[in-house]
Amino acid sequence: GIVHEDEIDNKNILQATYLAMRQAIGKLSIKPDIVLIDGNKADIKHYKQKNIINGDQKSLSIAAASIIAKVTRDQMMRQYDIIFPEFGFAKHKGYGTKQHFEEIKNQKASPIHRKSFNPIQNHLPTFAYIKRNHLINRLGKQLLACHLIRIGHEILELDDDNSQVKEIDIISRYKGELIFTNVDTIIVEYRRKNIESLTDVLEENRILDFIDNYIADQALDGKFQLYMSKIYLGKGNPKIKIFNKSIVNNSIKKLEENY
């Protein structure tokens, strides 16, 4: 099971851990006879438990699960490193190293940092800070990329000052298909009219030309999709809409709002 930073902030780390355990058990195709818990008794009902303090040192099953958990987490942090390269997640994997804390002080916390964690609370960016430093569009791309990770995408590229991606903001892979995502970040209180309008035809053609050249340059083959996305920033949590467009013979064949 995977529990993200917002759920940890809402529930606390212990309850979030229990939730991840329940998610993992719920995905099993066979009901286990017993659940081995590394530590004290967990809030898991309907299953017999065996609690083992320092279980990763005493149980091969728990040790193997710990390795899988660490490898999975490290892979996620490498994905987040593409989205937030300034924090060096690929190097320290999000742990509380000196370098990590220095970057938080210098850059302000990112959306994936736990807001309830005391060192983070002193370095949360305000909307005024984001606007003053011209980070609104970048934040929109980052939030959309984080959303794609949560629903199972592998992030390949994200458009920032150092990326070669131009017309497309995010390139990802999902269920074997290459996904090109265009992100439109909207501040709700400043654009109340026509906020539902889609990207115009000229821009779509320019985007398709970019995708066609990218596919040719990379000598890619297979299925491709274009996500035209909108992320609305305002009071409360961001609102995300993604319009899924299949690409066939360099033309848009289908439009479907899928998130």
Where are these regions (language model features)?
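Active-site beta-strand-loop-beta-strand hairpin of nuclease catalytic cores
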Residues: 171-187
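A generic structural motif
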Residues: 52, 173, 231-233
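A short, glycine/Asx- and small/polar-enriched loop/turn
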Residues: 44-46, 164-168, 174-176
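RNase H-like, Mg2+-dependent phosphodiesterase core
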Residues: 1-154, 259
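A structural signal for short, well-ordered beta-strand segments
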Residues: 49, 93, 170, 226-228
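Short, low-complexity, polybasic intrinsically disordered segments
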Residues: 230-259
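Catalytic cores of nucleic-acid endonucleases
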Residues: 158-159, 163, 184-241
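Conserved acidic residues
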Residues: 33, 169, 224
